[in-house]
Amino acid sequence: MPLIGKGNQAVGDLGEQTAADYLVKQGYRILERNFRSRGGEVDIVAKDRQGCIAFVEVKTRRSLAYGLPQLAVTQRKQHQISKGALAWISKNRLHECTARFDVIAVLLQDGSEPTIEHIPNAFDLAY
């Protein structure tokens, strides 16, 4: 898909779809996408083959001019994801579940297949 003229939101949406497709191919089950709560958010909530809930942050870039996508997951962003994850767990009454925080970095460049890097357990719960 040509990226020229696409805004950041469209590129981000394409990156999230690419990440979700990747997870499904790896045997994950997507439980929810774009979960929002007061002060928190999670791009993808998925369950891996072992039953662990993965709260996944997707970072997408069109080039490496501004650095690796995964480096954009700052401490502040980790805090927002953590708040979203806790809200999702509470909403779904899964207080006894095993969970982790993953990052998927997607590099989308015109004329190339997407480059995907999945980083399981990328960070711990951030308060």
Swiss-Prot record:
UniProt superkingdom: Bacteria
Family: Belongs to the UPF0102 family.
Coiled coil: none
Listed SUPFAM superfamilies: Restriction endonuclease-like
Single GO molecular function: nucleic acid binding
Organism of derivation: Trichlorobacter lovleyi (strain ATCC BAA-1151 / DSM 17278 / SZ) (Geobacter lovleyi)
Name of protein: UPF0102 protein Glov_2230
CDD domains reported for this sequence: PoNe_Nuclease
